[in-house]
UniProtKB/Swiss-Prot annotation:
Single Gene Ontology MF annotation: RNA binding
The protein's name in its UniProt record: Pentatricopeptide repeat-containing protein At1g31430
Signal sequence, renumbered to the chain: none
Keywords, ordered alphabetically: Repeat
């Protein structure tokens, strides 16, 4: 019997079984069967290897991938376009993008799949400039015509980079030489939205005969990202199919632009429609509660999470911690924090900041040291939180030590916000010379960054009667063109304290010339789940509960006067 005649059908049978397993995503079984094939003394061919290489990529088995690549070289299969393209796909899945490009460069012949594979590999690894570079190279070096894969992958890179030039070039190609598929239409809408060309995105959207929910979501997101919330809602209502991503995009828009009541109303509509919210929806709503101080609504969402047995992962848990902390319920925030099974950097940082903002700086520092001890990675935001705690608690020595530990122990480079925290801490403690020295080291920063720290030092100089520093800072501020009214107002106050009225007039005139106006102070409060906002100088007569407000003010004033009289009498 001729054995060579038996090997072909046996290999064919193995190839069919391997493909069936790969189609069913049983990638581990693919590798096991491949090992069995090799044990039988069979030689994999250009149909076997692509299936195996795909499975290796999905399982991220680097060593196995290198072995199969070595076999392909020995067997003379590496230059087969099907095998080469599969090698590129495997290395891209393994994150080895340089080897992916090397395989591409060594191919004697490249088809459109090869070019698309390299472009999508760069896109998948976040190297969007390189993806655009490959697209340009394909245009110049190859006579191959772009296909849907080329267009969609390159448009993804354009979206990420906001590269309108290449995006419009592809759009013109599609209009003149290609048919507008749903995938291409989605990619064009997304690209134009990300580049801020809403009208062009809408034109493409309206021209599409068939649209899926992804296309509707991209267009809604485009309107939301530019603040055109009402137009987004109209389009949202028109969408024939609404998945959880579309609902989330619309709700995020309301939260982002402080229209929280409408976000909650939409959430209730979502429940009525029978759409189960995912964690992204809940995090968005909890963020809105935190931003507006809507404690009752936050508690209601927490109740919904418990009643529906939603898994409180580290993202949802952190959002709950943040919401309770910002609403002043710090003990509840602590309870939620310690219930989170896998706490990450964001979880710890959120609670540290919450403790600091609720006047518990000592506990915030304790938590910071606990975070260090358990080995959680500290990032730049963590240090802003802990330095804020030092600032609020007046812990000068701890603040200095932690600031210096950023580079010495944690390999985190201090940024302007960290310096600002330490400068403010030093100013509050009256260590003005040290604060000024630190500001001098920030001279490379922008005016918008320097003005707040100058203001801190100027305010401290005024409070501590340090005229020399006040005048030095005033000189620096006079040279800065800023739109922040507080800097100019504070400078005028310093001059007024020194009876330099002509300088006060000059500052006021400069504010007028620059069109800078001092915005009135504002305070807000939530009562029975309803938010109320009060602005200095505002006409309160229009408030529906003005009589009750006045009555309470009179009662409070009388109570304070009574207490004052009792203290005087005693």
């Amino acid at each position: 019997m001729n054995m060579s005649l038996l090997q072909t059908p046996s290999l064919l049978m193995y190839n069919k079984m391997l493909k069936s397993l790969a189609d069913g995503k049983s990638f581990t079984k693919v590798l096991a069967l491949f090992g069995e094939l090799r044990g039988q003394g069979l030689y994999p061919d250009n149909f076997t290897l692509p299936v195996v290489l795909k499975s290796i990529g999905r399982l991220r088995k680097v060593i196995e991938g290198e072995k199969v690549h070595g076999y392909a070289v020995k067997a003379g299969l590496e230059f087969d376009s099907y095998v080469s393209n599969s090698l590129m796909g495997m290395y891209a899945s393994l994150g080895k993008i340089e080897i992916t490009h090397k395989v591409f460069d060594e191919m004697p012949q490249r088809d459109v799949v090869s070019w698309n594979g390299l472009i999508s590999s760069y896109v998948g690894n976040g190297r969007f400039e390189d993806a655009i570079g490959v697209f340009k190279r394909m245009s110049q070096e190859s006579n191959l015509k772009f296909d849907e894969g080329t267009i969609v992958s390159t448009l993804s890179a354009c979206s990420a980079l906001k590269n309108l030039e290449i995006g419009e070039r592809i759009y013109r190609f599609v209009v003149t030489e290609f048919e507008m598929s749903v995938r291409i239409g989605n990619a064009l809408v997304d690209m134009f939205c990300k580049c801020g060309c809403l009208d062009k995105a809408r034109a493409v959207f309206d021209s599409m005969r068939d649209k899926n929910v992804k296309c509707w979501t991209s267009m809604v997101f485009g309107y939301v990202s530019t603040g055109r919330i009402d137009e987004a809602r109209v389009l949202f209502e028109r969408s024939p199919v609404k998945d959880v991503v579309l609902w989330t995009a619309m709700m995020n828009g309301y939260v982002q632009f402080n229209r929280f009541d409408e976000a909650l109303e939409l959430f209730r509509c979502m429940q009525t429609a029978g759409i189960r919210p995912d964690n992204f929806v809940l995090v968005s709503l909890l963020t809105g509660c935190a931003q507006t101080g809507a404690l009752e609504q936050g508690k209601w969402i927490h109740g919904y999470i418990n009643e529906n047995r939603v898994t409180v992962d580290k993202v949802v848990g952190t959002a709950l911690v943040d919401m309770y902390a910002k609403c002043g319920c710090i003990e509840t925030a602590l309870e939620v924090f310690y219930e989170i099974k896998e706490r990450d950097t964001a979880s710890w940082t959120s609670l540290i900041y919450g403790l600091a903002m609720n006047g518990m700086s000592g506990r915030a520092l304790d938590l910071y040291y606990e975070m260090e001890n358990v080995g959680v990675r500290l990032d730049a935001i963590t240090f802003v939180a802990v330095l804020t705690a030092c600032n609020h608690g007046g812990f000068v020595a701890e603040g200095r030590k932690i600031f210096h530990s950023m580079t010495e122990r944690h390999n985190v480079q201090p940024k302007s916000e960290h310096c600002s925290c330490l400068i403010d801490l030093l100013c509050r403690a009256g260590l003005l010379d040290e604060a000024e020295e630190l500001i001098d080291k920030m001279r490379g920063e922008s005016d918008e960054t320097l003005v707040p720290v100058y203001c801190s030092l100027l305010s401290a100089a005024r409070n501590y009667g340090n005229v020399k520093i006040a005048e030095r800072v005033a000189e620096k501020l006079e040279k800065v063109e800023v739109s922040d009214s507080s800097a100019h107002t504070l400078l005028a106050s310093v001059y007024a304290s020194a009876n330099r009225w002509e300088d006060v007039t000059n500052v006021r005139r400069k504010m007028k010339d620059l069109g800078i106006r001092k915005f009135p102070g504002c305070s807000s409060i939530e009562i029975d789940g309803v938010g109320h906002e009060f602005i200095v100088g505002d006409d309160l007569l229009s408030h529906p509960k003005m009589d009750e407000i006045n009555s309470m003010l009179h009662q409070t004033t009388n109570l304070m006067l009574d207490l004052e009289h009792k203290e005087i009498d005693s």
